[in-house]
Amino acid sequence: GGPAGDFLSQGGASSEEIMAELEAARKDDNAKAVLIRINTPGGSTGATQEIVEEMDKIKNAGKPIVISMGDTCASAGYWIASKGDYIFASPATLTGSIGVYIDYTNVEGLAGKLGVTDEKIKSGAYKDMLSMYRPMVPEERAMLQGMVNDIYNQFVQSVAEGRHMDVAKVKTFADGRIMTGREAQNLGLVDAMGNYYDALDYAGGLVNMDGDVPVHTYDGGGSLRGFLNADMQHLGTWMGKGFADAVRSSAGTSSVSVR
């Protein structure tokens, strides 16, 4: 239950945990800036937007947000990062992956050879959309393409707003490609090359803190490091790690993935 549900398994952080940490930072009068370390290939669309909303609240409270990318900050990870005021990455960080795809498995032929039939009682013509036991009909394909286009446009618009770019410019590289941190900087998706401590120093400078910056860590038991570590036990709209084929359909499941 709760916002977006516990959409992860095997040690990943839920959106509830991440939002709670962001809320705590926003309400802490001693917190003058927020540094977010992101090391994730992605997560769910709805949860991503909930996290971004909390980030907007922090910025509206007058607290700057600095992003430090880890090994990977792709897809939903980049969606979140793009809302920061300043983004640091390492030259070899894997990022980008802005785009959307739907993947499902059709085993109708195999099931027929095995003598397996699928019977359903459903309330509407499209209730079993993405069934693995029948081909997709044109009307379903059109519906799903419309959904893909809508989510893609939301993703692109959010990145454009966060990075102060024209939507048309974002679309020139929002085709699902993975890029290095250096390539992302050349495209305007990253501000500077640097590690966590560089980002920490920069955040301190934004609030006129010289020397050692006092840090309080908000950690509700999860982190963006594990933002996507799911076994896809249900149909969902998912951001990310399509480049590593980590979000795939498996027997008995279908996935809608955004990357």
What are these regions (language model features)?
Residues 1-74, 86-89, 102-259:
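N-terminal organellar transit peptides
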Residues 72-75, 94-98:
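Short gly/pro/ser/thr-enriched loop/turn and capping motifs at secondary-structure boundaries
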Residues 79-86:
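Alpha-helix C-terminal capping segments
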